[in-house]
Amino acid sequence: MPHSQCKNNHEKLSSEISIWAAGRIVIMADYDEYCWIGENGEGTELDLEFPDWPEIRELHYAFLTWLCKMTSRRPGDDGRIHDFDWVAFHKEGIFLCKRLKSVLKESVDVCYMKPFEDPQSDGAGLIRID
């Protein structure tokens, strides 16, 4: 195996271990990120964590399209977005999470969380995706 390929495999494995060690991926729309990992919830993007996975790259772009539906809206003075179809937004977000879980299988927990901008999100916890 050429050194460069060996190095790429090592980098891929290191990347995967970093997110697996975190044990959980939380998908939550925010203005800068959609994916949060680790105990401290550091923001990241799936294609950065899994650069050599075509299925993840496809999901990354699907999550960005989903995220833009919310971030293109202007929040009110209270920081919430009131004129928005949150039911459809969450349905799509959970659907994408299920696709992500089907790719990652049992390697990590995938969870969904409603963003602060949803007026109905008060006290809403994590939804674990099975």
Regions found by a protein language model. Give the residues of each.
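Intrinsic low-complexity, intrinsically disordered or marginally ordered coil/linker segments
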Residues: M1-D130
